[in-house]
Amino acid sequence: MSSLIASRRYAWALLSAAEEGQFLDQATDALNSIKETLANSRDLVHVLRSPLINGDKKTHILEEVFKEIAGEKVMIFLRLLAHKKRAGQLPEIIGEYQKLLDEKNGVINVSINSAVMLSDEQAKDLVNKLANYTGKKVRAKMKLEEALLGGVTVKIEDTIIDGSVRHQLQMMKKFLLAGKL
């Protein structure tokens, strides 16, 4: 089984158990804290992925590192991952969990690149329009990209909406070279 499929299945299992057991908020908070810890500790991720370290040792490491932040139900899940030799996939499982939770809650991640910094009002207006366009709640990640020359580009999953001056100039060049203008 590919690691992505396995990660998604483990994430789905935890999400389902958290919903049924009514500890969804606690599990989500714990996983966010674990994700942050893993992002700040490459050594820990390396240890969890190492085939040289057995499952019992990984279980002990997970318990020592996360017992304060994980809570008992999430710790059971972490022990299961170590037992099933999937502890090394913990970062991917957390990522898949977040994606599944976002799907469940109707949230979509959007990247917005602009040539100039948008004002709070402009950003809020753009996010509202994107929410209307997608029919979902929008979690926007704003980024300044001066190479656009002007305008914005928006990436929604696999779709890119390019309203930049750079893109318009490229299209004009293409039409001029093709003799279509």
UniProtKB/Swiss-Prot annotation:
The keyword Lipid biosynthesis does not apply. It is a peripheral membrane protein. GO terms for molecular function: proton-transporting ATP synthase activity, rotational mechanism. It is found in: Cell inner membrane. GO terms for cellular component: plasma membrane; proton-transporting ATP synthase complex. Keywords: ATP synthesis, Cell inner membrane, Cell membrane, CF(1), Hydrogen ion transport, Ion transport, Membrane, Transport. HAMAP family: ATP_synth_delta_bact. This is ATP synthase subunit delta. It comes from Chlorobium limicola (strain DSM 245 / NBRC 103803 / 6330).
